[in-house]
Regions:
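Active-site-adjacent structural elements in enzyme catalytic cores
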Residues: 1-241
């Protein structure tokens, strides 16, 4: 009943929730966990790993055959697991279709109708970053969402590239910058269909440009003329005379 109420408040009728388990042994109580999956699950990046359900009766968490499982990745998470708590259902601190909130004042103001209480800290979060989501096949990670734990680490390519900004599409948006033989994919941004998400998208592009000292020589975008990412790319190209 608590999960149903959370779904009602979040307006999330069917989308699966993630589960944070105390450790890999706890994860094995509800899912099949291979050696390769445990290695990724227990690694320092701590993504959400899609694991096959071990038994029925967990449809309130996920209606399909898999559950997204992650292990604690901050000291605070470990403190939440008392003697009588082995697993926690997790969901992002956001309103439907808007970016995750990471400032205390904004969360308290906007999430009071969803959350019954708030666990806050005076150490402010500097950059919004969702959990990474992957599955494991043949010992390798395949991403549905490459974000916390992996960003802003670059990917090496086999040639020298010009300074590029690739703006991505509209749904499940992200962007990418290039410099030398490296490309720097951004974290997951979300669907670009409201001002809040667009503001986060443009702010993260500026943050990456400062972080890696990249001033693009060209901008790459989707051909769809009505995508917000395409409109942004066109505006930047005109502004910078690219």
């Amino acid at each position: 009943s608590m999960v149903r109420e959370l779904r009602r408040r979040k307006q999330r009728d069917e989308k699966p929730f993630a589960v944070m388990c105390r450790d890999a042994e706890c994860a094995r109580e509800i899912c099949l966990v291979s050696e390769d999956e445990e290695k990724i699950l227990d690694g320092f990046r701590r993504p959400i790993v899609l694991l096959r359900k071990k038994r029925q009766g967990l449809e309130h968490i996920s209606e399909n055959g898999f559950i997204g499982v992650m292990l604690p990745y901050t000291p605070l998470h470990y403190l939440l697991f008392g003697d009588d708590i082995d697993m926690l259902i997790m969901t992002s601190a956001n309103l439907s279709d808007t970016p995750m909130m990471y400032r205390n004042d904004e969360a308290v103001e906007k999430l009071h109708g969803i959350a019954d209480g708030f666990l806050l800290h005076n150490r402010d979060i500097q950059t919004r970053c969702d959990d990474s989501l992957c599955w494991v096949l043949g010992g390798a990670e395949y991403f549905s969402r490459r974000s916390r734990g992996y960003v802003p680490f670059p990917i090496t390519v086999g040639e020298e590239l010009p300074l590029l900004l690739a703006c991505g599409a509209e749904q499940k948006a992200s962007f990418c910058l290039s410099k030398g033989s490296y490309v720097f994919p951004s974290q997951h941004i979300g669907d670009l269909k409201n001002f809040e998400t667009l503001e986060n998208y443009t702010g993260q592009i500026k943050h990456f440009q400062r972080l890696f000292d990249i001033r693009p020589q060209a901008v790459v975008c989707d051909l769809h003329p009505d995508y917000m990412s395409t409109e942004y790319a066109s505006a930047i190209a005109e502004e910078e005379d690219l």
